[in-house]
């Protein structure tokens, strides 16, 4: 419908170009999920990467999406960095070969087909070795090292594989933000690598010149520097209204030229032309049911997973397992959890867990978690042991809360949920720009603001409600967010996670008394980009006693530990390389 509107009802009839994340599968709930990039690197087989790219492209184009923000070609030189799993590791040669193979699979021989997409490489460049492993921090590499180790990976993808576009990175190199680096974005990218398409800034990377790097005095100067350097497309830096206003101002005062604006426009139009969108902007609607998560793609995902498993040690020839084993304990927080890796959605189809796979291989009936041994199979016992982070926070349900009345916006005390007041800026001064009813406090605002009225760069939220638990129990109440949050109950500050020096993700003991009304106030400030905002509870501390007992009683214990979406991914950087949370 959107494409039809653009083509048939706008003045110039220029088709839309839709993009999506597709790091190891299209970012859709029904799409095939392939192994994460770091896992792919373990096979050392570019052909597998090309196969994956080809299948991801087919599923993507079948959904009328034309460009993918993939692959990630950063060299991960600091394992504390939360995005390490998105890369092919630290090696320039291996990353070059695997990245180029994915690009060839995605783009094929011709972009203007119903099974190919444009590849937008990221994050150009030097992004994978930030100071302290902190996402978006300046790189520890100097310019010489970036050109020696990082740039050849992108060169291979552009020059040898023909990648179309790129997303420039957040970081600075020797104090100069990449987003305003003319040599990197124009001289090398267009002059040497001959990239045919456009440069997109990473999300808010342009405005970060003003807010983080402090290399631009104003948002306008930040935009001007980016345009001059060779950035063609913004990514949620400015509202459309502000973007147009600033562009007009800069054209009027000579900060940028019409030639520069025309050049950026032509680059975007060129990509649309390469994709064949002017001739055929629509998709064959029968393709989706035939292609997305089809049997061929499922089989290939399984093959890749099997070929990328890495055995670090086989002490005392433990593998293959002896058929004489009669009791197996499957333990750990990841044993019955499908760990898919960052940048994929939770699938709407069933994903087989380690526990389920072991039971299937051994012929244990699927309906039983614990099954006694018999002649045909051993006994399988399972226990989670612990939550990775100790507190498995569950968002509090809306029917536990009655909103605080706001007659002016139609909120009454009989409404379930929270009265939410949104303020632009770093505090709660002035009047809220938006007051609404929020059913829960369970948000992810990294990709979009809560509302068009809210400034995604800096805003605060105050939620108020009366809480009444449907039953009495001893548990814990708390917050989960990398941003600033605090919790008040009956006017008392219960959790203080306000400011960069404090931790908002906390759980505190709390007795939920049935029938008692608690006055609740939760406050939030997006000083870490709003990737996770939760107000919730759990039923108290867990115990590992059962897991220990199972391990002692069994002939073999298979323990699944490690990271999860709670501990690894964008903005989940590490201070230690120990097993996270309570697993040690």
Locations of the language-model features?
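Glycoside hydrolase catalytic-domain context in secreted enzymes
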Residues: 1-476, 480-584
């Amino acid at each position: 419908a959107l494409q039809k509107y653009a083509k048939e009802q706008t003045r110039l009839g220029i088709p839309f170009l839709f993009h999506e994340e597709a790091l190891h599968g299209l970012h859709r709930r029904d799409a095939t999920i392939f192994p994460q990039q770091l896992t792919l690197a373990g096979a050392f087989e570019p052909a597998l990467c090309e196969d994956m790219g080809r299948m991801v492209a087919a599923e993507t184009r079948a959904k009328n999406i034309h460009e993918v923000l993939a692959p990630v070609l950063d060299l991960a030189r600091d394992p504390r960095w939360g995005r390490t799993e998105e890369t092919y590791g630290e090696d320039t040669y291996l990353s070059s070969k695997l990245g180029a193979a994915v690009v060839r699979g995605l783009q094929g021989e011709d972009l203007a087909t119903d099974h190919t997409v444009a590849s937008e490489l990221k994050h150009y460049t030097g992004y994978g070795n930030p100071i302290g492993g902190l996402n978006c921090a300046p790189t520890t590499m100097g310019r010489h090292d970036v050109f020696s180790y990082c740039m050849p990976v992108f060169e291979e993808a552009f020059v040898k594989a023909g990648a179309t576009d790129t997303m420039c990175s957040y970081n600075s190199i020797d104090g100069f933000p990449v987003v305003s680096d003319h040599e990197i974005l124009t001289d090398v990218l267009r002059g040497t690598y001959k990239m045919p398409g456009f440069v997109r800034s990473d999300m808010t990377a342009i405005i970060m010149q003003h807010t983080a790097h402090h290399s631009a005095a104003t948002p306008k100067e930040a935009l001007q520097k980016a345009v001059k350097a060779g950035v063609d497309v913004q990514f949620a830096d400015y509202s459309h209204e502000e973007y147009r206003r600033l562009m007009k101002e800069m054209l009027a005062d000579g900060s940028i030229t019409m030639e520069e604006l025309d050049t950026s426009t032509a680059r975007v139009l060129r990509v649309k032309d390469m994709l064949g969108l002017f001739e055929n902007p629509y998709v064959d609607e029968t393709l989706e049911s035939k292609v997305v998560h089809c049997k061929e793609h499922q089989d290939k995902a399984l093959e890749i997973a099997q070929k990328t498993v890495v055995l670090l040690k086989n002490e005392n020839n433990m593998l293959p397992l002896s058929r004489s084993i009669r009791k197996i304990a499957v333990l750990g927080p990841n044993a019955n959890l499908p760990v898919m890796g960052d940048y994929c959605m939770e699938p709407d189809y069933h994903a087989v867990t380690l526990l389920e796979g072991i039971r299937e291989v051994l012929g244990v009936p699927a309906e039983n978690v614990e099954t006694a041994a018999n002649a045909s199979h051993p006994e399988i016992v399972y226990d989670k042991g612990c939550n990775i982070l100790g507190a498995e926070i569950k968002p509090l349900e809306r029917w536990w809360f009655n909103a605080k009345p706001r007659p002016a916006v139609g909120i009454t005390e009989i409404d379930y949920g929270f009265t939410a007041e949104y303020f632009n800026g770093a505090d709660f001064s002035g009047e809220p720009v938006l007051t609404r009813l929020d059913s829960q406090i369970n948000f992810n605002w990294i990709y979009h603001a809560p509302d068009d009225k809210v400034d995604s760069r800096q805003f605060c939220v105050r939620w108020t409600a009366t809480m009444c638990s449907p039953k009495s129990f001893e548990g814990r109440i708390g917050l989960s967010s990398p941003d600033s949050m605090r919790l008040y109950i009956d006017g008392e500050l219960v959790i203080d996670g306000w400011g960069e020096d404090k931790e908002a993700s906390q759980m505190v003991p709390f007795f939920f008394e049935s029938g008692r009304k608690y006055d609740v106030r939760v406050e939030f400030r997006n000083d870490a980009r709003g990737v996770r905002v939760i107000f919730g509870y759990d039923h108290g501390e867990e115990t590992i006693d059962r897991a220990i007992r199972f391990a002692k009683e069994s002939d073999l214990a298979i323990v699944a530990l490690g990271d999860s979406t709670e501990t690894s991914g964008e903005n989940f950087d590490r201070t230690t390389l120990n097993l996270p949370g309570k697993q040690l």
